[in-house]
């Protein structure tokens, strides 16, 4: 069984050195994109993975498709669109490795995922689907609905990373309403502390669990340098970030989501997870994500389980 990720793949041009975009003199080209990152993490950790996305018929798209192939992510659901461009992100880093983004995204191939692209998917081989909030607009919105509705009916586990990017949506009210529209599909959600209020209207995760996330199986609540909280039924697990010097946090949240999902799928019975097992999954995901911040780039920083065990 496999993991299918639907949504964006783009190129991160990461500023070399510390400083704002206008101060950076050169950039390093890295493959990235929230859901593409999760596909690569799942593959690294032993799960067959597919990416359902659309890339431009351009050199950037060639680079990204070749990256997926090098990472052994199956590309049979990757389409190429000649009349749109591959999205780009320019990333600047501060002294802590935290990021600021400038995107070339509107009108890009990510928003051209079609219903025909979705119709090609064989759900009988898919155990879990992962998506995020960036691509649920324009043509791709309807395609997400089509896939997730079919997946829900087929009993496929659905994972969602809120991953807010306000500068990619013109109307933030529509952004909020659109995300809420997709929440009924979701079994596993990752939401950051700085995203919770926009999504739920409260800064209190306990309130959000009762009001907005009550139908979900697992809630991953990330708190940056303060670690994470993981909720499953009556269990609550708290993790702390290991003492690691961060160089670049690009893709760390995706590493957390992807590594937790991978461990969750390894569990024999998703309806019966002990607090001890949940704690082990959460600790693995926290440590895995932290280790990826010691290198620049997202996909290029991801580890196999053997590489992880050699470092931890």
Regions found by a protein language model. Give the residues of each.
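Ribokinase/PfkB-type carbohydrate-kinase core domain
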Residues: 1-4, 69, 96-237, 268, ...
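Conserved phosphate-binding/catalytic region of the ribokinase-like
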Residues: 149, 205-312
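Short beta-strand scaffold segments in enzyme catalytic cores
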Residues: 40, 88-92, 227-231
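Short, conserved phosphate/pyrophosphate- and ester-handling motifs at nucleotide-, phospho-/glycolipid
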Residues: 42, 192, 253
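Beta-strand->loop->alpha-helix junctions that form or flank phosphate-binding loops
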Residues: 54-56, 76-84, 220
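Glycine-rich phosphate/adenosyl-contacting loop at the front of the ribokinase-like
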Residues: 1-73
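Active-site metal-binding loops of divalent metal-dependent hydrolases
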Residues: 9, 162, 255
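Hydrophobic beta-strand scaffold residues
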Residues: 49, 75, 158-160
């Amino acid at each position: 069984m496999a993991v299918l990720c639907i949504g964006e793949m783009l190129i991160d041009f990461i500023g070399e050195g510390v400083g704002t975009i206008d101060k950076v003199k050169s950039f390093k080209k890295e493959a990235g994109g929230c859901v593409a990152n999760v596909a690569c993490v799942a593959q690294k950790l032993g799960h067959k993975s597919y990416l359902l996305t659309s890339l431009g018929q351009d050199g950037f798209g060639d680079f990204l498709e070749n990256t997926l192939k090098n990472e052994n992510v199956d590309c049979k659901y990757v389409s190429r669109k000649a009349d749109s461009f591959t999205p780009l992100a320019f990333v600047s880093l501060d002294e802590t490795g935290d990021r600021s983004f400038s995107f070339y995204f509107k009108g890009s191939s990510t928003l051209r995922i079609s219903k025909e692209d979705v119709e090609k998917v064989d759900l009988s081989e898919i155990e879990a689907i992962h998506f995020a909030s960036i691509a649920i607009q324009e043509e791709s919105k309807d395609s997400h609905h089509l896939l997730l509705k079919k997946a829900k009916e087929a009993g496929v586990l659905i994972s969602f990373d809120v991953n807010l990017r306000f500068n990619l949506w013109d109307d933030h009210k529509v952004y909020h309403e659109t995300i809420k529209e997709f929440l009924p599909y979701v079994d596993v959600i990752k939401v950051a502390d700085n995203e919770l209020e926009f999504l739920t209207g409260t800064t209190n995760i306990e309130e959000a669990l009762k009001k907005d996330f009550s139908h979900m199986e697992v809630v991953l609540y990330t708190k940056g340098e303060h670690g994470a909280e993981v909720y499953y039924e009556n269990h609550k697990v708290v993790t702390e970030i290991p003492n690691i010097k961060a160089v670049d946090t690009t893709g760390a949240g995706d590493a957390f989501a992807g590594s937790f999902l991978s461990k969750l799928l390894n569990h024999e019975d998703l309806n019966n997870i002990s607090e001890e097992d949940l704690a082990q999954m959460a600790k693995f995901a926290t440590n895995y994500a932290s280790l990826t911040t010691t290198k620049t780039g997202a996909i290029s920083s991801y580890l196999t389980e053997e590489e992880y065990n050699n470092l931890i």
